[in-house]
């Protein structure tokens, strides 16, 4: 029986392994990576004390992307901005007129995008075109058919409030207790992915008259006539883009 012997050269070739060099971590970094992106700017709108929001029957509409021209973090630095995220934190407190009655109501908050504001903020009735007979029922409102090309509802949230015919300072008799009700509620929302692009005129203020295209409104309406005041703040996360 014959056996074949491997040569030493064959053994040395057999033991050799082809190794591939791993690319360096520096080579994996690409231009425009997350680490290189500028951080979002923040604007905070506070409503408390004399600046609280009064929400009457029929609702209220406020411009919230009020980025004035400037160098601070909350200012726009260019002629165009992109609003990405919004954090909303408010206490809704039923007013004295509403507390006189035992009532419950479903209110609504919307974020509404206005493609062409035209220098003046609209009213909730302009946006939703509700008849007076539905003024107290905002959950039924829809954007006007004639203006659906202009107004776009980005977000919509419902909330419930109630009153029991008493105000918060009333004191129950010693032999009784009153069940708590939702005359004072905390409303919190955080939403992202808005992508609201705003083009600004060549002016320095941040009012609706300075917006050429792309206003963002916060619309709040009480349900069943249960009017209230709003105390808290709205924080907007945005970027300045486009030309100087």
UniProtKB/Swiss-Prot annotation:
One of its GO terms (cellular component) is host cell nucleus. Changing residue 20 to N: Abolishes nuclear localization. Transmembrane segments: none annotated. Changing residue 21 to N: Abolishes nuclear localization. It comes from the Viruses. Keywords: Capsid protein, DNA-binding, Host nucleus, T=1 icosahedral capsid protein, Viral penetration into host nucleus, Virion, Virus entry into host cell. Residues 1-39 are annotated as: Disordered. GO terms for molecular function: DNA binding; structural molecule activity. GO terms for biological process: symbiont entry into host cell; viral penetration into host nucleus. A motif (Bipartite nuclear localization signal) lies at residues 1-24. InterPro entries: Gemcoat_MSV, GV_A/BR1_coat, Viral_coat. Pfam families: Gemini_coat. It is found in: Virion; Host nucleus. Homomultimer. Interacts with the movement protein. Binds to single-stranded and double-stranded viral DNA. Belongs to the geminiviridae capsid protein family. Encapsidates the viral genome into characteristic twinned ('geminate') particles. Binds the genomic viral ssDNA and shuttles it into and out of the cell nucleus. Plays a role in protection of the genome from degradation, virus acquisition and transmission by insect vectors, infectivity, and systemic movement. The CP of monopartite geminiviruses is absolutely essential for virus movement. This is Capsid protein.
């Amino acid at each position: 029986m014959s056996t074949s012997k491997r040569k030493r050269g064959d053994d040395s070739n057999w033991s050799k392994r082809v190794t591939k060099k791993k690319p360096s971590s520096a080579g994996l970094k690409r231009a425009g990576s997350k680490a290189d992106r500028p951080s979002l700017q923040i604007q905070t709108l506070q409503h408390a004390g004399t600046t609280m929001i009064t929400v009457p029957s029929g609702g209220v509409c406020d411009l919230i992307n009020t980025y004035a021209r400037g160098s601070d973090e909350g200012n726009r630095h260019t002629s165009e901005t992109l609003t990405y995220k919004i954090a909303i934190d408010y206490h809704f407190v039923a007013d004295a007129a509403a507390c006189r009655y035992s009532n419950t109501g479903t209110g609504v908050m919307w974020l509404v995008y206005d493609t062409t504001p035209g220098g003046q903020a609209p009213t909730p009735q302009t946006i939703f075109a509700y008849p007076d007979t539905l003024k107290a029922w905002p959950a039924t409102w829809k954007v006007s058919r004639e203006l659906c090309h202009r107004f776009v509802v980005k977000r919509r949230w419902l909330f419930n409030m109630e009153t029991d015919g008493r105000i918060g300072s009333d004191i129950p008799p010693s032999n009784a207790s009153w069940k708590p009700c939702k005359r004072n509620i905390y409303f919190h929302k955080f939403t992202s992915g808005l992508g609201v692009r705003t083009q600004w005129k060549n002016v320095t203020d941040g009012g609706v008259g300075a917006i050429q295209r792309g206003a963002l409104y916060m619309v709040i309406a009480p349900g069943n006539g249960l009017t209230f005041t709003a105390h808290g703040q709205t924080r907007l996360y945005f970027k300045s883009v486009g030309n100087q």
